[in-house]
């Protein structure tokens, strides 16, 4: 009898050996995965099946999901940029609103890059980095929130309304406009605000405004002729012809501070009864008070780096640190040292306290030159415009003088105001020195200062007729 030999045993041993090899390979792969997961990912085939692949995919998927739900913590600057703090511009494709469109014109006047030319991003040090962008709509910056904001005309609907008649919607809209506007003010009617003894234009003469030669980095802008102040003014005429409106459809129309002053609404009873913000005078306090503006009157500040800045300092605003660059007006310190001997010097600015107070702490740390400081919260907000009502000082207005580059800032006490030319970078400027003799004379006369200021500067003659 012949017996058949079964060949299953070798196959079984071979299978066992295969299973042993696969187990070893499996453990080896798990060890290699623990030691070098990146290398293991490269060795794995593009499509895996089985329990190990499922576990890996589950781990990878949960990690990515966790990253998406809990992103890495960003720096303050990056987080603020995402929240659109420094730029209130709508994203590309959104139609810019009218107040934002006006900012482009003003930026050109003050020598800054226009909003249509660059899109600014934040660096880690709080500076702005210009990146070319041809499709970005106009932008507004933080300047309008910590620095002095720009004045805007009253709307035709509420031009003749009182400051107390604003509806909540109008008040909110006005505040939003102020927040959107830039800090740097246009040199409005420099002929009227000059203090070098030059004659002011008569009410019947046409007024022209041009960009001053000392404005940094600006191109010559065409002159715009303003109708005579004796001509009747209506909201429809708006001080501009139809041709001018077509040419400057998206630009900022020329701002007439005296038209603004003429139509400013009266103060409300609540505003008139505000408590004085300053302490009572002491025996050592000079009898006369001199109120000084800050931005473009004594200094020029910018968030953009200025190569000729006299000093720089950081400002913490809404959890973000910004670097402020400061230029000092020529004869700034000499003027303050001489005037502080005969006047009670009071700084009154429409800027935020977080910026202005820190700057004054650097310039006058012991308060030897400036006795008191008033900020935006001490101004009167009239339909979105900050006006400096001198009644809040608690001082005798017959012995109080205010110097400001914006006449509309002292609209309620026009006879107490001395206009001065806006300053940005002119190193040959002497406007502060030119005021010294007149200010000294007012103290020597020891009379009501208002008639002398009115006769010298004749600001009332610049007001449009009724």
Curated annotation (Swiss-Prot):
<dbReference type="Pfam" id="PF03031">
    <property type="entry name" value="NIF"/>
</dbReference>
<feature type="region of interest" description="Disordered">
    <location>
        <begin position="1"/>
        <end position="111"/>
    </location>
</feature>
<feature type="region of interest" description="Disordered">
    <location>
        <begin position="192"/>
        <end position="242"/>
    </location>
</feature>
<dbReference type="GO" id="GO:0004721">
    <property type="term" value="F:phosphoprotein phosphatase activity"/>
</dbReference>
<feature type="compositionally biased region" description="Acidic residues">
    <location>
        <begin position="30"/>
        <end position="39"/>
    </location>
</feature>
<keyword id="KW-0904">Protein phosphatase</keyword>
<dbReference type="InterPro" id="IPR036412">
    <property type="entry name" value="HAD-like_sf"/>
</dbReference>
<dbReference type="InterPro" id="IPR004274">
    <property type="entry name" value="FCP1_dom"/>
</dbReference>
<dbReference type="InterPro" id="IPR011948">
    <property type="entry name" value="Dullard_phosphatase"/>
</dbReference>
<dbReference type="InterPro" id="IPR050365">
    <property type="entry name" value="TIM50"/>
</dbReference>
<feature type="compositionally biased region" description="Polar residues">
    <location>
        <begin position="46"/>
        <end position="62"/>
    </location>
</feature>
<comment type="function">
    <text>Probable phosphatase.</text>
</comment>
<dbReference type="InterPro" id="IPR023214">
    <property type="entry name" value="HAD_sf"/>
</dbReference>
<protein>
    <recommendedName>
        <fullName>CTD small phosphatase-like protein 2-B</fullName>
        <ecNumber>3.1.3.-</ecNumber>
    </recommendedName>
</protein>
<feature type="domain" description="FCP1 homology">
    <location>
        <begin position="283"/>
        <end position="442"/>
    </location>
</feature>
<feature type="compositionally biased region" description="Basic and acidic residues">
    <location>
        <begin position="63"/>
        <end position="82"/>
    </location>
</feature>
<comment type="similarity">
    <text>Belongs to the CTDSPL2 family.</text>
</comment>
<keyword id="KW-0378">Hydrolase</keyword>
